[in-house]
Amino acid sequence: MNQPSPAIPFELAGPRRVVFGPGTVHQAGALAAGLGRRALVVTGGNPSRASVLLEHLRAAGVEAKVFAVPGEPTIELIRAAAAAAKAHSSDLIIGFGGGSALDTAKAVAALVTNGGDPLDYMESFGRRQPLMRSSLPVIAIPTTAGTGSEVTRNAVIGSPEHGAKASMRS
């Protein structure tokens, strides 16, 4: 008779709130309005897919600026997205798309409040500095399944200069 494996203790830190189900994107405007008034919406390579989200944000009084992520996030792309968020005076970041859009959103939310460069906070090839301030609020709306980016604090970012990817924990 097989003996059950002993329980291995662990701790799981997840998102504060998960809203799940068909059509829940229709709640995004009201949810966003409770967190901020000026959102940077980070999308995948086809920003028109976010049109329903943008309609709900407008209806809820949230001013949105769209930043499209054409592929996997890189250090340069994160810098550009953070600059767009600052120029828009964003107080909320919304990721809408696959893992690349969601990872970009999380990294931008951390950079806007902490300042500096993505390399300051990157593991492996970065300076590994801790983030000292809380990130801007983030709403993650996955449109694909697979990465689980919506339930982690990690943002995986590539650096062509280093020939590698590393995490930035928001």
Q: What are the roles of these predicted feature ranges?
A:
Residues P22-G23, T43-G45, F96-G98, I141-T144, ...:
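Fold-independent oxyanion-binding glycine-rich loops
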Residues L53, A82, A101-N114, V151-T152:
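Short Gly/Thr/Asp-enriched flexible loops that form oxyanion-binding sites at enzyme active sites
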Residues K65, I94, P137-I141:
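Hydrophobic/aromatic beta-strand patches that form the interior of the parallel beta-sheet core
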Residues T113-S170:
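A glycine/threonine-rich phosphate-anchoring loop and its flanking beta-alpha core
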